UniProtKB/Swiss-Prot annotation:
Positions of disulphide bridges: none
Keywords from the named record: ATP-binding, Cell inner membrane, Cell membrane, Membrane, Nucleotide-binding, Translocase, Transport
Molecular function terms, GO-annotated: ATP binding; ATP hydrolysis activity; transmembrane transporter activity
GO biological process assignments: lipoprotein localization to outer membrane; protein localization to outer membrane
Every ABC transporter domain range: 10-239
Record-given protein name: Lipoprotein-releasing system ATP-binding protein LolD
Subunit architecture: The complex is composed of two ATP-binding proteins (LolD) and two transmembrane proteins (LolC and LolE).
UniProt-listed SUPFAM superfamilies: P-loop containing nucleoside triphosphate hydrolases
Organism for this UniProt entry: Anaeromyxobacter dehalogenans (strain 2CP-C)
Entry's family note: Belongs to the ABC transporter superfamily. Lipoprotein translocase (TC 3.A.1.125) family.
Length: 239
């Protein structure tokens, strides 16, 4: 008997996105087709202004396309109202950004607990246990109760990774997660993302300008002027 085929984590079909300012319409994405399978570790590359952040916003259920279809974890976003999109986003997707956006007055543990408290509307003892477990997994067991401002840049980004994993997402979207780090810290953070991908089967889509890191992904998707121009295990020559 054949093994069941896992539902792709991301499916985009003919996706277009225009931004409208009065009478001016600015097309940003032009008929993008993209499928990201469950458990893939994919880099998204392209020059500034190519539409990478716009694409990530659509996949992250932070915006809706002008045309085409977006499916995340098997759900067609066209069938979801705004509340349902927010619930799906909270349950299904984790985010890691170049700027970690930690609350400076909160401890590492409190920052990781924020998504859990937002989902339940209150704090609970099991949240602290989960947060501690995640922070230990990212190597921060010794600084659980240290405020964000007392942590190094690499440590702060590790807290952000733990926070992104707090709701056990199927998909993590990482937008330049190593952009503010030195080479050593960037390698450590990238290795952590890869470890969670391999150990937990989480799908990762990582925006990066760093070809050295992109080459360590399973797949590289290149976006230029709102169109996918390459998709495979290697970058285009000279890209």
């Amino acid at each position: 008997m054949a093994e069941p085929v896992a539902t792709p984590t991301v499916e985009l079909s003919g996706v277009r996105k225009d931004y409208v300012a009065g009478p001016v319409v600015t097309p940003v994405l032009h008929g993008v087709d993209l499928t990201v399978g469950a458990g893939e570790f994919t880099a998204l590359m392209g020059p500034s202004g190519s539409g990478k952040s716009t694409l990530l916003n659509l996949i992250g259920l932070l915006d809706r396309p002008t045309g085409g279809r977006v499916r995340v974890a098997g759900l067609d976003t066209a069938a979801l109202d705004d509340d349902a999109m927010a619930r799906t986003r909270g349950r299904t997707i984790g985010f890691v950004f170049q700027f970690h956006h930690l609350l400076p007055a909160f401890t590492a543990l409190e920052n990781v607990m924020i998504p859990m408290m937002a989902a339940r509307g209150r704090a609970a003892p099991d949240m602290a246990e989960c947060g501690e477990h995640l922070l230990r997994q990212v190597g921060l067991g010794a600084v659980l109760h240290r405020r964000a401002t007392q942590l190094s840049g690499g440590q702060q980004q590790r807290v952000a990774i733990a926070r992104a994993l707090a709701m056990a997402p199927r998909l993590v979207l990482a937008d330049e997660p190593t952009g503010n780090l030195d080479t050593h810290a960037a390698d450590e953070v990238f290795a952590l993302l890869r470890e969670f991908n391999r150990r937990a089967g989480i799908t990762f889509l990582i925006v990066t300008h760093d070809p050295r890191l992109a080459d360590r992904c399973d797949r590289i998707v290149e976006l230029v002027d709102g169109r996918i121009v390459a998709d495979g295990p290697h970058r285009r020559s000279g890209a």
